[in-house]
Amino acid sequence: MKLKKILLCTSSYKTGGGGIASYAHDFVNQFNSAYNIIIITHDNYTPSGSDIKIYHLNMNDFSINNAKKLLIIIDEEKPDIIFNSNFHLLSIISPFIPNNIKLISISHFVNDKLAWFAGFNAQYIDNIISLSTYGKHYLEQKFKIKQPDKISIIYNYIPSISTPNILSKINRNILKIVYPGGCSFYKSAEIVCKAILKLLQTNIEFELYWLGSIKIPGGNWKFTNTKSIRNILPNDYRIKQLGPVSREEAQKILKETNIFLLPSRGEGFPISLLEAMRGGCIPIISDAKHGSLDIITHKKNGIIIPQNSSQAIVNTLIDILKKHDQYIHIYTNSLDTINTQLNSHIWNKKMNILLQKENNHIPRKQLTQIKFFFLVLKARTYLIYHFIKDRRRQLYHFIYFRYLQYCLKH
């Protein structure tokens, strides 16, 4: 029997650089035996012994010639289903894809650019996958989507660990704290940095792992000496890791974490949270509207703290470190959440229901230069707006991190 064909268009397939690539690989692992999968990726991923056909295409080249290249690939491959995982050019040409193809886009973030390109041209898309209830609400409001079945909430999943050793973690004398957000504004890096500085002023024993980028905004500017987190955090023996590691090493660290710290301002549905929870841990998240709130219940399977409060982080960490016995139930509850709500069986079931749905788009049309021009213009206004917002965030981070260093010296 001939397998149906899925074309997965992704902004990244090269692991180690973020959740979108991880999502793509997990997607392929789940569907590769049931479907014939083709990949189009924006990055320079190099296959290593894979039997999956992979195309490379610049998703940010909005020329009509590049759009035609993508349409030619679609015409030659003749997929039954196309998944758009943050592939910007595909969002723009959605109105020109053949009507018989089911088109599903994935919104990897609760709002902002990743959500914009998932909902762009929504009337020509059959379904949109949101990773959270907050993300679904944002898409409905932003793109005025009235159809109740247009957007489906399908949480990420994580393969379970055969023998998570919770008991050894509970019995540790020195607890491991892991923050996996690098210097990201969305992960509240500056708030976490300030909290760590306060925590390091105590004599409490712990091990800290800061995973991800350590270069702060303005780090390449030759007129400043404050270039990375290393210039702000002291040389303290309790800091065990500062900087990026491979995905495999990150998974090992997350598996062994006691306290998982990710008080994000915005999220889709963080894979790192699931990677930590499947080993049993105490997750700490913020009360900002993002996907983590869909699965974390305060003091049951995690801790929820006020957003933008470094003192709340410090107080919570100190309380856990000093009164660890009062929190050990969270280890098993977080693991149970993964095993009962976020496993591959549930994800597969929801995805297959989505794939069996009838096509749900208005009639698509032929590509013309004038129609394409106006769609590109609209997309570029999104990107310009995002660029301005991002520069403001970068300026805030530039000032805040240097303020922290100034406070240390004075």
Predicted region positions:
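Short alpha-helical donor nucleotide-sugar binding micro-motif in glycosyltransferases
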Residues: 244-245, 252-257
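Conserved donor-binding/catalytic core segment of Leloir-type glycosyltransferases
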Residues: 7-9, 129, 169-187, 193-196, ...
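Conserved acidic donor-binding segment of nucleotide-sugar-dependent glycosyltransferases
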Residues: 298-299, 303-310, 319-324
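Nucleotide-activated donor-binding/catalytic signature segment of Leloir-type glycosyltransferases, i.e.
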Residues: 222-245
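Short His-centered aromatic/hydrophobic patch
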Residues: 84-90
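Aromatic "clamp/platform" in nucleotide-sugar-dependent glycosyltransferases that forms part
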Residues: 265
